[in-house]
């Protein structure tokens, strides 16, 4: 989905199409900058959907090469 950026009172804004707008009860959002990208989430919910989701698939990292457990001196 594409949308436009515009300026409102010298502040850059993004216009969200109705089909992807936030629910009406969302009044505040967090914006996380990742390089040239921006992630917009309701305040306090940035990780909630990930933890509430299905999680990783059963084969996630099934072929991961893990080093042997190291013997370490205790504290």
Curated annotation (Swiss-Prot):
<feature type="domain" description="SpoVT-AbrB">
    <location>
        <begin position="3"/>
        <end position="45"/>
    </location>
</feature>
<dbReference type="InterPro" id="IPR047976">
    <property type="entry name" value="Anti_VapB2-like"/>
</dbReference>
<protein>
    <recommendedName>
        <fullName>Antitoxin VapB</fullName>
    </recommendedName>
</protein>
<dbReference type="InterPro" id="IPR051734">
    <property type="entry name" value="VapB_TA_antitoxins"/>
</dbReference>
<dbReference type="GO" id="GO:0003677">
    <property type="term" value="F:DNA binding"/>
</dbReference>
<keyword id="KW-1277">Toxin-antitoxin system</keyword>
<keyword id="KW-0238">DNA-binding</keyword>
<dbReference type="InterPro" id="IPR007159">
    <property type="entry name" value="SpoVT-AbrB_dom"/>
</dbReference>
<comment type="function">
    <text>Antitoxin component of a type II toxin-antitoxin (TA) system. Upon expression in E.coli neutralizes the effect of cognate toxin VapC.</text>
</comment>
<comment type="similarity">
    <text>Belongs to the VapB family.</text>
</comment>
<comment type="subunit">
    <text>Forms a complex with toxin VapC.</text>
</comment>
<dbReference type="InterPro" id="IPR037914">
    <property type="entry name" value="SpoVT-AbrB_sf"/>
</dbReference>
